[in-house]
Amino acid sequence: MGKKKQKKGSTSCRELTFDEEKRREYLTGFHKRKMQRRKAAVEEIKRKIKEEQKKMREERHKEYMKMLKEREEALCELEETDELEGLVTSKCESVQYDHPNHTVTVTTISDLDLSGIGLLPLGKAQQEEEEENEKDADEEQPKSSVSLPKKAGDPFLSKKICSLTASLHARSQRKAGKRPSRTNDKKKQTSGKQVSGRTSKAQRRKQTGKIGRNRD
């Protein structure tokens, strides 16, 4: 017999070798990788909640300062109007003139205390009386310093924060994973079993009679 001829262009077979440790880690590490992904998702949710809370605090502070500024301006305007009204001691009747586009009201003032603004100097007696009145008012009313109001006790939460906290709570519940209790299974097993106790002779005869009839 002649020798077998080798086929032209034949190539040797390639052999693939795997690292056993890495292969074992990959095949047995599905749960581990799943827990790592879940942990990373929880950390991301916590980070988003902190950023949203910080943003809400800044917005709340800006609105609060704006409201405080508006109140201070309104108080200043009221004080100015009260001072002007206090200077007028007596008024005459006002007269209104109606025009097609607007109305004009003319009020005549007979007496005006210009010393209240500081345009005219007060007499010594009036100065002493005002100083005494100011001292009495200071004693009756304690000094109040303008300060920012305290923050509210309840946190100011947005819809985004509520949704993030709900998802975080759901993930934590999944992570906990309640195990089924074995006490219920034991109770079911015990309830299925018949309680065996002492029986009388007549009862035993009845039972044996029933068994015999069934056999027949």
UniProtKB/Swiss-Prot annotation:
Organism: Xenopus tropicalis (Western clawed frog)
Compartments (UniProt record): Nucleus, Nucleolus
Any coiled-coil regions, as ranges: 30-83
Gene: nol12
Annotated stretches, region: Disordered: 120-154, 167-216
InterPro entries, per the entry: Nucleolar_protein_12 (IPR019186)
A molecular-function term among this protein's GO annotations: rRNA binding
Similarity comment text for this entry: Belongs to the RRP17 family.
Feature: compositional bias, Acidic residues: 128-139
GO cellular component: nucleolus
Compositionally skewed regions (Polar residues) per UniProt: 191-200
The protein's name in its UniProt record: Nucleolar protein 12
Role of this protein: May bind to rRNA.
UniProt biased composition (Basic residues): 171-181
